[in-house]
Amino acid sequence: MSVKTKEKEMAVTILYEQDVDPKVIQGLKVGIIGYGSQGHAHALNLMDSGVDVRVGLREGSSSWKTAEEAGLKVTDMDTAAEEADVIMVLVPDEIQPKVYQEHIAAHLKAGNTLAFAHGFNIHYGYIVPPEDVNVIMCAPKGPGHIVRRQFTEGSGVPDLACVQQDATGNAWDIVLSYCWGVGGARSGIIKATFAEETEEDLFGEQAVLCGGLVELVKAGFETLTEAGYPPELAYFECYHEMKMIVDLMYESGIHFMNYSISNTAEYGEYYAGPKVINEQSREAMKEILKRIQDGSFAQEFVDDCNNGHKRLLEQREAINTHPIETTGAQIRSMFSWIKKED
């Protein structure tokens, strides 16, 4: 069903528990390939939803014992793929093609369902399944630990549901039921396409959530410290307080955030915001989106993976040693409510 607001009907279709049939996924064997952030959440939530699930891992995986202790059936990847009707691939994007070719492809049977939580490899053609299998996606809009936590607390994280290939005629029934199994139907399942999920997800990560946000925070911190302000104060102003502002926006929108801050801060938002995110920034965003759409970014990422992640590791080291990180570690050690890393 479509969801209506007071102003207009939303362009997307959102489905809830009453709109899906749990018996579909409960009547199928599911193989979860991988037991990382999303893998553990999918496997445990499905198991708790009464689904026959097994986890496929490489021999000697450090996650093998962890999954078994959680009550899951654990096998090697080939066995999981051979036994399953629905094979959910939840290893990292860059190794999915290799895992698919070496452990999954030979075990696919007509009528099986190949599933993903991100459309990267299907959309860009790095994995090309046979025509006689379903290809679906259940993409929770949150990290795995949140997907699991929300499920155990009785709620759920919204899911995107997509069908790329419907070989059996009931691929939509399967993906919607799968989303129910991981808790998505509790908060809403949004119908989308593989192209929409892949391109919008990558753009959001690069231009706003990860790339844009990190560079904005770094630039603010560097501007203040280069002007002679103490790094500790710069950290508080440009980094620490960010969560509080985002929480207000997340809970009730930008208007509520503006209601909650001072008039001085709100006026500064309107004055300075367009100077920081200006037409040049918007043109850069358009170029980022274009490179995502035409596959240039995907190929660059794959090339770097094939080169031993050279660029990724260099950039990771640079941010890990940036003054904002060393300052942040010192500041956060003062906060008793922040859980310390082991």
Swiss-Prot record:
GO terms for molecular function: ketol-acid reductoisomerase activity; magnesium ion binding; NADP binding. Binds 2 magnesium ions per subunit. Belongs to the ketol-acid reductoisomerase family. PROSITE patterns: KARI_C, KARI_N. HAMAP family: IlvC. The lineage of its organism: Bacteria, Bacillati, Actinomycetota, Coriobacteriia, Eggerthellales. NADP(+) binds at Y35, G36, S37, Q38, R58, S61, S63, D93, E94, I95, Q96, G144. Keywords: Amino-acid biosynthesis, Branched-chain amino acid biosynthesis, Magnesium, Metal-binding, NADP, Oxidoreductase. This is Ketol-acid reductoisomerase (NADP(+)).
